[in-house]
């Protein structure tokens, strides 16, 4: 079953598939197996890369970095940065243009390189998870939406938060990267939910909600609420983004309520019964690590000069759009 009609990755082999051993045998096999070697993981990675069309990989990883590099070498693009001295995004045509274009220009080569590398890191995990979840087309639509909407919304939020504090120009692709971080949270859970569905299809007697385990994609909202609670509650280290304990507490309550509702409706998320092969397990571990590092690096531990308000907008929009699809899928 797919979320949007495009093909999913072929099912990975699982312990006990078709051999009649039952779930207890699966658990013993899982416990007895040895960790994969680096060579085995490398072979699995290369096989996964070769299984995807080269044109599709190029479309995912090359056009946006090429655009950012091209903009950086064009003469006169320094004027594309957003001045925080303006009164609003709609003040003039020039302001509206710079509100959009500022997300595609950078202040230094290091700034550009940092955002390109972050983009590749995020998509290196988000793309294979999208294949597993059946979200290849949804990733394309989300990318187009992020490029069109996030720059304007992040510019508006930046002007509201910092417009009266400084007149320094704002620039950088980190708001859109933060949107991909939000997407990654949604697709991480969606991919695990797809794994759960395939496991249930193989063993109808071990339906979701039994001791076989499984993950519901809607648990992603708990992670987002919890991460926003930490972002607003923890000291950021910069004066222009002080802790807001009341806001953090509201998000913490929202996370707790969402967790309670989901626990009552679908049970807690459990990975034990899905039967992932080691290489697939590694993908989810890396994805979770990228999410954790991304939230800390863009929303919690904020370097001076980093536009955390743009990051927040990108993260929330980036999660909300695909999560709306999860809700629509039922």
Which residues fall in each region the model found?
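Di-metal (Zn2+ and/or Mg2+/Mn2+) metal-binding site signature of metallo-dependent hydrolases
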Residues: 103-125
């Amino acid at each position: 079953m797919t979320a949007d009609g495009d093909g999913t990755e072929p099912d990975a082999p699982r312990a006990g598939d078709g051999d009649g051993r039952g779930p207890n045998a699966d658990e013993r096999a899982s416990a007895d197996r040895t960790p994969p070697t680096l060579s085995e993981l490398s072979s699995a990675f290369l096989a996964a890369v070769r299984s995807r069309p080269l044109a599709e990989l190029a479309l995912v990883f090359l056009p946006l970095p090429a655009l950012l590099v091209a903009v950086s070498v064009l003469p006169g693009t320094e004027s594309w940065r957003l001045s925080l001295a303006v009164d609003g995004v709609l003040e003039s045509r020039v302001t509206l243009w710079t509100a959009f274009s500022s997300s595609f220009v950078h202040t230094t080569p290091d700034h550009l390189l940092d955002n390109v590398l972050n983009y590749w890191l995020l998509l290196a995990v988000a793309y294979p998870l999208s294949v597993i979840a059946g979200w290849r087309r949804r990733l394309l639509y989300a990318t187009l939406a992020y490029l069109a909407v996030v720059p304007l919304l992040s510019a508006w939020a930046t002007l509201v938060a910092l417009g009266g504090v400084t007149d320094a120009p704002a620039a950088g692709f980190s708001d859109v990267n933060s949107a991909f971080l939000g997407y990654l949270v949604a697709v991480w859970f969606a991919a695990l939910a797809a794994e759960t569905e395939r496991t249930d299809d193989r063993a109808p007697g071990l339906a979701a909600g039994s001791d076989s385990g499984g993950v519901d994609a809607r648990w992603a909202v708990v992670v987002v609420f919890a991460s926003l609670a930490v972002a607003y509650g923890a000291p950021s280290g910069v004066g222009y983004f002080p802790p807001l304990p009341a806001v953090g507490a509201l998000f913490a309550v929202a996370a707790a309520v969402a967790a309670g509702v989901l626990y009552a409706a679908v049970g807690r998320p459990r990975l034990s019964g899905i039967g992932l092969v080691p290489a697939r397990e590694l993908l989810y571990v890396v994805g979770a690590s990228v999410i954790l590092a991304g939230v800390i690096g863009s929303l919690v531990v904020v370097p001076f000069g980093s536009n955390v308000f743009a990051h927040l907008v990108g993260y929330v929009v980036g999660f909300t759009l695909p999560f709306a699809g999860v809700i629509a899928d039922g």
